[in-house]
Amino acid sequence: VANALQTVLHTALCCLKARCALIASCPHVALGVGGRLGEILRGVLIRHGANPDLVQWIFRRASRATTSAFMTHSGVALVVASAGATVLRAAHSSGRPALGMGAANTPVWVAADADLAEAAQLIVASKSFDHGLTPGCEHNLVVDRAVRAAFVEALEQAGAVVLSDYDVEHFARQALDAETGSLRADLIGQSAAEILAHAGLDRGLEPRLVVVPQAPDKVLGPWGREQLA
């Protein structure tokens, strides 16, 4: 799974309601928090007289081979994969029934007649929840040119930091992987304040969200992708 807490908790509840056991495999950056959640769930099962082994997880650094071995095991009734393209392909070619969820990259259109203050508040609240790890939250904003300036102001009032053109170039050099163009792995799931500090753009504030403006011809570039932060 990619989003350890939300995905494991939701999947565990679905499995338990269906009277099925669960084995969770979290990415290495989430092994600690994933294991802690597993312990909490097992504790709840024990308190209610249920078998704690209904919820299990891979608690050491798992390789792709280990994950594949679990997914292809004949005792597995269903594979639920929320991860990158490689894991999704492995899940759907495992020979077991599989449900896969990849990048969402949800866009939002802010029209000229929108309530800009409400739109900004809802977008900032949604994208900043869980430090942007929710695939279904807003990842790209498409704003009508007629209200762009007013919407930028509304975003800032809602707690966002909207970068200037100069800051965008500097921020990209610090936040994106030079080889892949993707967000640096150590910034995934980090707060807006931590990301700005890493890029040397600490404003002395407690921002809830970093907004990186892009020209229309740049939408297929790195910042047009899903950003899990």
Q: What residue spans do the PLM features occupy?
A:
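Substrate-binding/gating loop at the entrance of the active-site cleft, primarily
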Residues: 1-20, 27-39
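ALDH superfamily catalytic-core signature
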Residues: 9-24, 43, 88-223
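Structural motif
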Residues: 25, 57-60, 82
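A glycine-rich helix N-cap at a beta->alpha junction
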Residues: 42-58
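A structured beta-alpha segment of the ubiquitous adenosine-cofactor-binding alpha/beta core
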Residues: 55-76
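Short acidic loop-to-helix transition motifs that present clustered carboxylates
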Residues: 60-65, 85-87, 105
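Glycine-rich phosphate-binding loop
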Residues: 76-91
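Conserved glycine-rich beta-strand-loop-beta hairpin in the small C-terminal domain of fold type I
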Residues: 224-229
